Amino acid sequence: NRPGCDNYMEPYDMENAKVAVQTTIREAANWKLVIENNRECYHCNGSHPELLKTLLEWDDVTDPRASQAFKDQVAACTSAWDAEKIPYAHASFGLRNRIVRMPLLDGTVSMTMDGKQGSKKLMGRIKNPDLGSMRILHLPHSWNHCMGDHLIVFTVWPISAQETLVTTKWLVHKDAVEGVDYDVARLREVWDATNDQDRRLAEENQRGINSDAYQPGPYSKTYEFGVINFLDWYSERMLNNLGEESAHVRKVAGS
């Protein structure tokens, strides 16, 4: 937990959280493709009907695609966040770490099928369940959604050149009682569906790349900036790891 993240995590009191359920799926796709699929959100509208019952399309009011209604909703939510002393200012620690808090779809408070609380017992010191979702990106292998009632933690691990494990953990307050405060099937329903949809997308991308007919194309700076940031971070890490040998690679890349 980086020092810069501490104040963002404080309201959730992670020392008093527990894992309600955990799943791991195997994807027949390269680890890098799995991360790129997560960083690219243009596919969401056509691929994730369950997730879009609560998740808004944008996560930044400066996004040129963001509607005025979205900007107005964010502005309205900040007063509630301020009242509960919930941090929400965007924070980035280079390209590797990013934190952003955004509201969920108006009228919903959690990533469940009906948008209602997945756990009756709220996390940490939180009193208001309608705090949207705090999203934490940690390259190279983790993204997270933190809501008032539960958190969802994702980790991605390569196991071969074209196989990846994706583990998802749903965390609730340590005193929440299964069958009383939360139902495991309901808690995991949205992301079980979303993970399987993302698995299919990553595997289809892998099959396409394996084809002799494959040709890479450009990324959109508007719709795919998350992928571009990931690739910039990844490329820089690889070059740094090469040390002196990277000079030739940098020269070729810049030519």
PLM region spans:
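C-terminal catalytic domain of Rieske-type non-heme iron oxygenases
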Residues: 1-255
